[in-house]
Amino acid sequence: RALSVPTDLIGALAKHTTLAHSVWVDARKNNDFQRFLPQFSKVLELRKEEADAIRQDTDLSRYDALLQDYEPDIKSDYIDTIFDTLRPALVDLRAQVLDRPPVQEINGHFPVDNQRALCNEVAATFGYDFSRGRIDTAVHPFCSGSGNDVRITTRFDVNDPLGSIYSTIHEVGHALYEQNIEKEYNFSSIGRGVSMGVHESQSRIMENQLGRSEAFSEWLFKKFLDYFGDIGIEDSASFYKSINSVKNGFIRTESDELQYNLHILLRYRLEKWLIDGHLNADDLEYVLSLIHISEPTRPTP
């Protein structure tokens, strides 16, 4: 599979994905998709070339050819069946929940240093081994590494400490999966996660099933009072409702347990259309406008 992709294409992908990331960081900060579009379009075309090289002499679609790097032996028609089943129920549930009165929200000023200290304590509480990793800051949270060097990142907003806390918990879920692979398998073909789906299940379990549980919310509420003082919420029951509230949002990594799934459903469909040639990169803004998704200018933290 790897040998089917020409060396010059591999080099071009490495070059242009790196360039695209740096441009994306600037475009994201300024809410300027047109700034990012040329690099995005270039990477998209290169990915199509990669898919075509991989799928030679097979019946795979472009999307399915690339999907094998993330979900081995899974094809998009299987994913379609799952998502098509989930979508109506999720949309209906979303409408019901958003129709309810809003819950009390956390309010205040949350210094970055305090958030960072709390994130470190939360990570350690979940079992993250700092002797084999560290937490840094990035525009987009991620986990990287394996074995004895598994690092994670988070990001901070002085107006929204939940973003950093739950990004940290999510990435700790990824990190724990990697840190708990048997040491004898380090640097071998089986010394890594089985698939991205399994990997994401570990991060989402930590973030939602544990991180948004009532028991954990009681502990976290006390920590919030210790680190930040007045947070606009006076009891752990209200705090529990706040960390589980459902509301519209444009950022997948900061979305609630319900909206997150809808982010994935939308991105999956758009991604398939882009890779398989049914949608051009410069049509994305128009398509999103048709479904009333238009992100406002980002506030300065």
What do the predicted segments below correspond to?
Residues 100-105, 150-158, 182-189, 250-255, ...:
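Glycine- and acidic
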Residues 13-161:
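Contiguous, non-catalytic segments that form substrate-binding/exosite surfaces or channel walls
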Residues 166-179, 200-204:
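Active-site recognition of the HExxH zinc-binding catalytic motif
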Residues 9-12, 39-42, 82, 111, ...:
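Secondary-structure capping and boundary motifs in well-ordered enzyme cores
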